[in-house]
Amino acid sequence: MKSALKKSVVSTSISLILASGMAAFAAHAADDVKLKATKTNVAFSDFTPTEYSTKGKPNIIVLTMDDLGYGQLPFDKGSFDPKTMENREVVDTYKIGIDKAIEAAQKSTPTLLSLMDEGVRFTNGYVAHGVSGPSRAAIMTGRAPARFGVYSNTDAQDGIPLTETFLPELFQNHGYYTAAVGKWHLSKISNVPVPEDKQTRDYHDNFTTFSAEEWQPQNRGFDYFMGFHAAGTAYYNSPSLFKNRERVPAKGYISDQLTDEAIGVVDRAKTLDQPFMLYLAYNAPHLPNDNPAPDQYQKQFNTGSQTADNYYASVYSVDQGVKRILEQLKKNGQYDNTIILFTSDNGAVIDGPLPLNGAQKGYKSQWICPYISRHLLSLNPLLACCRRYSRGER
């Protein structure tokens, strides 16, 4: 059993990062997992240190977007091929010329493309599930979510079993400052409706989502949390933002607020003189996306469709947020010792623009997602890894 797992679990979230050379704690992971008393919780066990993992403790940023399709980035020659895109289904509100879609997609991700140029792009990376909750559970546990009874978003919102070891617990046990910013979606939750006169078409506006205490991020390995517990949140005026256990007001556009929080984490780790592990989970470009982004993002796009412009602007807001974070890392002298793993929770949604859509359709685009790893090893730029990877054991 262990031999078979070793061959397939190269693809777990932790092993993917290990392959990037980061796990200073790898030799101790199996002992940590035993504390959970679950015999099947083997995703973090049986790893040994490498020459890179024993050199020190690099900072780690695990950065996710929400419903970003593989085709949103030019991962291979077919990503932005007009002939490939001609017969793709697109709902009327997002129908724009293929050339305009390609141009907008390219303009929306310059920073992410630079990370890809600097690191490794995984052209055959698959998520563990086609929807958010189970997929994120795989990120945190390194295990197929079916192993612990999570088959849907509804299951995830009943809470990931407390017997499961979460990735940040291992970092925390080995001296890391750990922080989660953005979307959580792994707690047992309760929803309290907001007054009817404040409800909107965006269902995320219509209730405040609370997490049960045991499933709070601070009880799953994170020293600090700022974000939301549900499947999504409004881009403006969210009623469901929390800093640790206290509700906090929304401040402007949600992507900017999450970026500001992430920069605060980076600065705090420097002040504490600790290595850090940051899980930064943006909600963009999750729908509905009816409201335009701030002008510095929105003005970049003029596809002929307001909804398509809103979509691309939300992606660009994250891209520029990542740029700000990278600049802060460089300013603080942390950049050269920071590993960045970028991905999406699942593929693009049906109700979205080209280049790629397909989440919840059972198509390949629901399961294959962008993976980029910017790490400390001396690897050639534009290196592509075509071996199949998945965030959960099979």
Residues covered by each model-derived region:
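Gram-negative bacterial Sec-dependent N-terminal signal peptides
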Residues: 1-28
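Formylglycine-dependent sulfatase
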Residues: 30-394
